Regions:
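Short, leucine-enriched amphipathic alpha-helices that occur as contiguous helical runs
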Residues: 61, 145-147, 151
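Short cysteine clusters
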Residues: 155-161
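Acidic, glycine/proline-rich low-complexity segments that act as flexible tails and inter-domain linkers
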Residues: 1-60, 71-139, 168-171, 178-181, ...
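Amphipathic alpha-helical segments that form the core helices of the histone-fold
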Residues: 67-68
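Short, intrinsically disordered, charge-biased short linear motifs at domain edges
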Residues: 137, 142-147
Length: 196
């Protein structure tokens, strides 16, 4: 059913899945490929599976993957995923909003994680003082913006933010299955970005 995968074509097919050029060099992927490590095959399958979600269309899955690349500051993956997202109909405003969302969530994740750790009345009651106008009327739509915010917050480990954004996604018509699929995209692309 599956053709025999050699070291070269396992790496090549992995790169093709996420639009990285064949000549792209990753020390860690090269080490795994040199050993024909079975994890590369698993990773390729995982990447393909999360990009073919039941509850996310391909454009949405790619924009979530892009949010991971931006969060992890992975320039090669950002470029590759932007191209794939554009091929699925994403425009410059949507791509820019993904970047803005990731940046804002990084501020919020640090701030609210601090509040959560401290459990002190002063910190809990003091105004955050963080401008968040992009959350009011997002180009991507409120439900999807909240879904992106949830994934980035999960990546950054902010329990308060994850809980809040999960409820907001549900309030805006999202489903638990859609949330689960989005977080899976985030998890798999985080695992890939470790190697790239």
């Amino acid at each position: 059913m599956y053709p025999f995968a050699t070291t070269g074509n396992t790496k090549d097919s992995l790169y093709k899945e996420v639009n990285l050029p064949a000549e792209f060099e990753s020390v860690l992927i090269n080490k795994l490929a040199a050993l024909d490590h079975r994890y590369l095959k698993d990773l390729k399958i995982n990447l393909g599976n999360v990009l073919k979600s039941q509850t996310l269309n391909r454009k949405e899955a790619l924009l979530i993957a892009l949010s991971v690349a931006v969060n992890e500051k992975n320039a090669a993956l950002i470029t590759a995923l932007e191209e794939l997202a554009k091929a699925e109909g994403a425009d410059e405003k949507e791509i820019a909003e993904v970047t803005a969302c990731v940046s804002l969530m990084n501020a919020n994740n640090v701030f609210y994680r601090f509040r959560h750790f401290m459990h002190k009345e002063f910190y809990d009651n003091a105004p955050a003082g963080i401008k968040m106008s992009i959350m009011v009327n997002p180009v991507l739509g409120k439900e999807f913006f909240e879904l992106l915010s949830l994934v980035v917050s999960a990546l950054n480990g902010c329990e308060m933010c994850v809980t809040s954004h999960e409820q907001s996604v549900l309030n805006h018509g999202g489903t638990p299955a859609r949330i689960f699929d989005a977080v899976r995209v985030g998890a798999i692309f985080k695992s890939f970005s470790v190697l790239v």
